[in-house]
A protein has these predicted regions:
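Short beta-strand element of the alpha/beta-hydrolase
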Residues: 91-100
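Bacterial N-terminal signal peptides
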Residues: 5-15
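Aromatic- and Gly/Pro-rich amphipathic surface segment
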Residues: 38-86, 93
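Short amphipathic alpha-helix adjacent to the substrate-entry channel of hydrolases
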Residues: 108-128
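Gly/Ser-rich "nucleophile elbow"/oxyanion-hole loop immediately N-terminal to the catalytic nucleophile
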Residues: 142-146, 157-174, 178
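Short glycine-enriched nucleophile-adjacent loop
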Residues: 159, 181-188
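Active-site loop->helix "elbow" adjoining a glycine-rich segment at hydrolase catalytic centers
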Residues: 100, 178-181
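Active-site glycine-rich loops that stabilize anionic/oxyanionic intermediates
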Residues: 39, 99-104
Length: 188
């Protein structure tokens, strides 16, 4: 009887493996690097673990953009950056990309990895930021101080790592979509 109770306790404590969505992994050959050492500053509580998946509409059909479904990441509490280096010639320029998603999720492929693939094909290093979402709602607007902190920190880290990453520190730009565009304007 005790082994059965123990087994049920483990199942209820951990949950079903199929019920847990794995966190977003970058493409092979790329690694997510935490942007904050140790404890993340101004950490906000996030309900549940980080999630990733394909965006669906209200009836459960995959939402398509240009005929393709798109992936999202949500409930991000540990922000990371993923560096995509140019495979051919390197211009020395770098762009930090902030995906959009209304400060609730991140459109990680459509406004992230696909953009990085295009930038690297042009000889530009791309740094994809997976910033903290969702943001805290404050009145009619979202208070996204934590996402802005992540953006500022990432640009600073890119400048710090410019030499080893073969980047000219005077050629670092930012590019954002939707909420990410708001962040790009805020730190410019």
């Amino acid at each position: 009887m005790k082994p059965l109770i123990l087994a049920l306790g483990v199942v209820f404590a951990v949950g079903s493996p199929s019920a847990q969505t794995p966190a977003w992994p970058p493409s092979p050959g790329h690694a997510q690097v935490p942007i904050w050492p140790g404890v993340v500053p101004d950490a906000q509580p996030v309900e549940g673990p980080e999630e990733s998946g394909t965006v669906v509409d209200r009836v459960g059909s995959k939402k398509l953009v240009a005929g393709r479904p798109w992936a999202y990441v949500g409930r991000v509490s540990q922000p990371t950056m993923t560096v995509y280096s140019p495979e051919g010639s390197n211009t020395g320029a770098a762009v930090v990309v902030f995906p959009g998603g209304g400060y609730n999720i991140l459109a990680i492929d459509l406004e992230g990895t696909e953009v990085c693939d295009w930038l690297t094909s042009k000889g530009i290093t791309c740094v994809l930021l997976k910033y903290r979402v969702p943001c805290v709602k404050s009145g009619p607007y979202l208070d996204c101080r934590t996402a802005l902190e992540d953006a500022q920190r990432t640009v600073g880290l890119v400048r710090l790592q410019a030499a080893p990453w073969h980047i000219d520190p005077h050629k670092i730009g930012v590019l954002g979509f939707s909420a990410g565009g708001h962040m790009a304007a805020a730190i410019s």
